[in-house]
């Protein structure tokens, strides 16, 4: 009789439980075994939403309120604006009420509330709680109407005026600092940093590559921009421990430095699927039946404030398009470059993309088709060039050296010089 696991993250305590978890892991193509069962599983809950928010809830946190109050400044910066305004108003009103009560007690103990008393009062014209409250407001806000003022009759009253002035300055500094820090947060900068809706896998420089596109909608630059990516999936260790979210780094050029990007126009981030890649053994069929999530991160400093911002998104396995490329968005004109963001999320299919894994491709188990086939990006670039020439009055055909039997497509299919694997805008 198998044992029951009381904790979903505990060590597997029996062979039966181990077989159950092994079946779960093998089903999505990431088990420890060599066989893969291609059965479509229910998609996992997204760990990072498309807008960058983490889909995580914290429960059973001990002394949560005390911990948040201990770091009250960060708490005020992180909370919503409506709660910030509530704290702003309460801080001033409570301080006015507190010192108003103090001045009223001083007047009460000194006998200033007795109208028949003719001796000098501690605070002139303070003969009720309302008057004491108004004097407190005038002192802390330095209004000074002139009717109510402290005298030298009571040293304690003089001390309280000085003390309230200091407390008022502290409250002003704290509130203004929190509001300015909240306004200067680079969080809203992420609204103008966009990731493509889908990632793609296609051939680039003779190798299978995972690619996604990132763009900056503002003209202001993102200083020291760099990208990172991680693959999240569940796995079982050799000791039988079930890890629900194992994080594996995806190399996007950290060693060579090409993870640092100049984000002026949309850029395609490229991950070469080599022997060190977690996608090395996955074919198109494996991707279609896999259950994992790729988290992509863009970091940099906001040019206006020099504060670091981080933009996040993620791609599930069913959001990766095998055999697709992104449509070009950057077009060269006479005096400038233009970016067409209506094409930012669009892809087109590349029919000759191998369906096997990168391992099988590296081991020559798949024969590639002619690499010099006419490319869609070349067609778009040539079409744009022809339109520009026609607008300038240049004849469409100006070359007389080409043989009559060779068309434009064959001319465009001349092999180009191999270029190093770098992420760039595709023209």
UniProtKB/Swiss-Prot annotation:
This is Inward rectifier potassium channel 2. S-nitrosylation increases the open probability and inward rectifying currents. The modification S-nitrosocysteine is found at residue 76. Belongs to the inward rectifier-type potassium channel (TC 1.A.2.1) family. KCNJ2 subfamily. The keyword Oxidoreductase does not apply. Coiled coil: none annotated. It catalyses: K(+)(in) = K(+)(out). It is found in: Cell membrane; Cell membrane, Sarcolemma, T-tubule. One of its GO terms (biological process) is protein homotetramerization. A motif (PDZ-binding) lies at residues 425-427. Residues 129-140, 141-147 dip into the membrane without crossing it. Activated by phosphatidylinositol 4,5 biphosphate (PtdIns(4,5)P2). The chain crosses the membrane at residues 82-106, 157-178. GO terms for cellular component: dendrite; dendritic spine; glutamatergic synapse; intercalated disc; membrane; neuronal cell body; plasma membrane; postsynaptic membrane. The record marks 172 as: Role in the control of polyamine-mediated channel gating and in the blocking by intracellular magnesium. Its main location: membrane. Prominently expressed in the central nervous system. Also found in other excitable tissues such as heart and skeletal muscle. Homotetramer. Homomultimeric and heteromultimeric association with KCNJ4/Kir2.3. Can form heteromeric channels with Kir2.6/KCNJ18. Associates, via its PDZ-recognition domain, with a complex containing LIN7A, LIN7B, LIN7C, DLG1, CASK and APBA1. Residues 1-81, 179-427 are cytoplasmic.
């Amino acid at each position: 009789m198998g044992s029951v696991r009381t904790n979903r993250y505990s060590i597997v305590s029996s062979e039966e439980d181990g077989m159950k978890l092994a079946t779960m892991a093998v089903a999505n193509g990431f088990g420890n075994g060599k066989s893969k069962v291609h059965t479509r599983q229910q998609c996992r809950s997204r760990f990072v939403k498309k807008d960058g928010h983490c889909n995580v809830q914290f429960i059973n946190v001990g002394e949560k309120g005390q911990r948040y109050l201990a770091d009250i400044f960060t708490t005020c910066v992180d909370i919503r604006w409506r709660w910030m305004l509530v704290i702003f108003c309460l801080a001033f009103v409570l301080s006015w009420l507190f010192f108003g009560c103090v001045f009223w007690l001083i007047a009460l103990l000194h006998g200033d509330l007795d109208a028949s008393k003719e001796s000098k009062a501690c605070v002139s014209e303070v003969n009720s709680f309302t008057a004491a409250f108004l004097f407190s407001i005038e002192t802390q806000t330095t209004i000074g109407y002139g009717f109510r003022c402290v005298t030298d009759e009571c040293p304690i009253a003089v001390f309280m005026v000085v003390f309230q002035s200091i407390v008022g300055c502290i409250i002003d500094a704290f509130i203004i600092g929190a509001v300015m820090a909240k306004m200067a947060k680079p969080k809203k900068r992420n609204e103008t940093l966009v990731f493509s809706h889908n990632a793609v896998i296609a051939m680039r420089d003779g190798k299978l590559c995972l690619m996604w596109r990132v763009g900056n909608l503002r003209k202001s630059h993102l200083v020291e921009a760099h990208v990172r990516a991680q693959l999240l999936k569940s796995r079982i260790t050799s000791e039988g421990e079930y890890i629900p979210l194992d994080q594996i780094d995806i190399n996007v050029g950290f060693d060579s430095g090409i993870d640092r990007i100049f984000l002026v126009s949309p850029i395609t981030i490229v991950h070469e699927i080599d022997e060190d890649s977690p996608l090395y053994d996955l074919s198109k069929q494996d991707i279609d039946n896999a259950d994992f999530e790729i988290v992509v991160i863009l970091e940099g400093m906001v040019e206006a404030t020099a504060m670091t911002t981080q933009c996040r998104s993620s791609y599930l396995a069913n959001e990766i398009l095998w055999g697709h490329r992104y449509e070009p968005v950057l077009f060269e004109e006479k005096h400038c470059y233009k970016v067409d963001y209506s094409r930012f999320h669009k892809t087109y299919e590349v029919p000759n993309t191998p369906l096997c894994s990168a391992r099988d491709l590296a081991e020559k188990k798949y024969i590639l088709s002619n690499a010099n086939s006419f490319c869609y990006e070349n067609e778009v670039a040539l079409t744009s060039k022809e339109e520009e020439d026609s607008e300038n009055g240049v004849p469409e055909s100006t070359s007389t050296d080409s043989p009559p039997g060779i068309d434009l497509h064959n001319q465009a299919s001349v092999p180009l010089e191999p270029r190093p694997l770098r992420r760039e805008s595709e023209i």
